[in-house]
Amino acid sequence: MIEVSGKVKWQSRRGMRELDLMLLPFVDIDLPNCDETTLKAYVDLLEASDLELVRWFNGTQEPDTQSRKEIVEFIKKCHAKRMGHEGV
């Protein structure tokens, strides 16, 4: 279990409600149970713009690095699991 800093939690609050609905539960519920590599990938993901993140999460654009692609897919899976859509 890792400690998620207040800074990372604050940076997870974005300017778009759609992103907040994906990222805030992830940072509070799922990320603390991950390893340092996942935390680093998530922190890197937060450097992207809101528009990039929305496009990556809704699948209209591919993330620009493999690391970002993997963390986006992981966040989407965690979100689907929380929503009861594990097989999606």
Place the predicted regions along the sequence by residue.
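Positively charged, polar, low-complexity stretches
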Residues: 1-88
